[in-house]
Amino acid sequence: MEQEFVKALPILHHLMKAGHQAYFVGGAVRDSYMKRKIGDVDIATSASPNEVERLFKRTVDVGKEHGTVIVLWEDETYEVTTFRAESEYKDYRRPEAVRFITSLSEDLKRRDLTINAMAMSAEGELLDYFGGAHDIGQKLIRTVGNPEDRFREDALRMMRAVRFMSQLGFLLEKETREAVIKDRELLAHVSVERKTVEFEKLLQGASSQEAIQTMVQTGLIQELPGLSGYEQQMLEASGFPFSSLDAREERWAALLLFLGLCPKSAEAFLKQWKLPGKVIKKAMQIISVYPAQLEAEAMYRAGEALFSAVKIGMLKKHKTIDEQKLKEVQSLYEQLPIKSLRDLDISGADLMELRNRRAGKWVAEELRRIEEAVLAGKLPNRKHDIKEWLASWDQH
């Protein structure tokens, strides 16, 4: 049993000692079975939320009505959720009501995919009622039970299925795929924010190529913000190794380059996904300096976006980042005498004092002239030299 589970075992033992059932569930169990790095460890129990709160000193109520309580244990936090059954779903995204139960198999039955519906006991025994281990062996993404029922309960599950394709390198099982084609329009009931989370995870997956192609082939792409009508561009984008880029703004910038949108449309597209303003701004900066130019003035104007543009260019051309070349670009950038106007050894206030003039457009124009001369290597970035240069300029 991995260390992540060992650290959480006292919670299971504490619940069991009080007469309750308790198991590890979800993604951590899946990743353990697949010998992958384990993320958050979640626990399912027959204890009610109130009983969980009584048993543990430090808890946080994050949704008791849905059965979930956070337990703080040593330096970790664990989601402890009561076994539950769900009534009919409303709006294709949440159940009308939740009923607490005492059956683990009934609890696991309501989960989205077989690979996520496995549990593990305190002794390390795998409990797999729905063939998750078999599907992992076959590298298949399959829903628990009828796929149409699962997708009508929560339409986001269609995106989750394709996202796991990208992360795990699995294929969509035939019936699950057919249900996506049939029910894809239900995704309209899901908030943009939830779609964005899944789409960004998909782009980060090592098998995003197959996942993007599946989204196009099933028509799922048509239900995503701003992508209907861009099927061909998305097929071209599918061959790009998005997972090789570290920052989310870099992945969005790369996607924009494949879509071929003008700056105004590109910004509107990013806003449709309800991305943070900072991410939008950075992505727009990257595409504005792409393809990267390595002249001093161009590098200066590009700033930090230069490196993102260089990486995207390498990946588009060679599918890999040449770290040595990237270091050479970074070295060239570091050799710039200034990285921003603030780095000039003279300020607008200095100029006003020197000229004995009030503020006006002339200050920005003069700073721009100094900036150009410093970048071109014609003028050292020292106040004394700049003043001398300005004096000689005045005499011309």
From Swiss-Prot:
HAMAP family: CCA_bact_type3. It is an enzyme of class 2 (transferase). GO terms for molecular function: ATP binding; CCA tRNA nucleotidyltransferase activity; magnesium ion binding; tRNA binding. Keywords: ATP-binding, Magnesium, Metal-binding, Nucleotide-binding, Nucleotidyltransferase, RNA repair, RNA-binding, Transferase, tRNA processing. PANTHER family: CCA TRNA NUCLEOTIDYLTRANSFERASE 1, MITOCHONDRIAL. A single active site specifically recognizes both ATP and CTP and is responsible for their addition. ATP binds at G27, R30, R111, D154, R157, R160, R163. Homodimer. Catalyzes the addition and repair of the essential 3'-terminal CCA sequence in tRNAs without using a nucleic acid template. Adds these three nucleotides in the order of C, C, and A to the tRNA nucleotide-73, using CTP and ATP as substrates and producing inorganic pyrophosphate. tRNA 3'-terminal CCA addition is required both for tRNA processing and repair. Also involved in tRNA surveillance by mediating tandem CCA addition to generate a CCACCA at the 3' terminus of unstable tRNAs. While stable tRNAs receive only 3'-terminal CCA, unstable tRNAs are marked with CCACCA and rapidly degraded. CTP binds at G27, R30, R111, D154, R157, R160, R163. Its cofactor is Mg(2+). This is CCA-adding enzyme. Belongs to the tRNA nucleotidyltransferase/poly(A) polymerase family. Bacterial CCA-adding enzyme type 3 subfamily. Its EC number is 2.7.7.72. It catalyses: a tRNA precursor + 2 CTP + ATP = a tRNA with a 3' CCA end + 3 diphosphate; a tRNA with a 3' CCA end + 2 CTP + ATP = a tRNA with a 3' CCACCA end + 3 diphosphate. Mg(2+) binds at D40, D42. One of its GO terms (biological process) is tRNA 3'-terminal CCA addition.
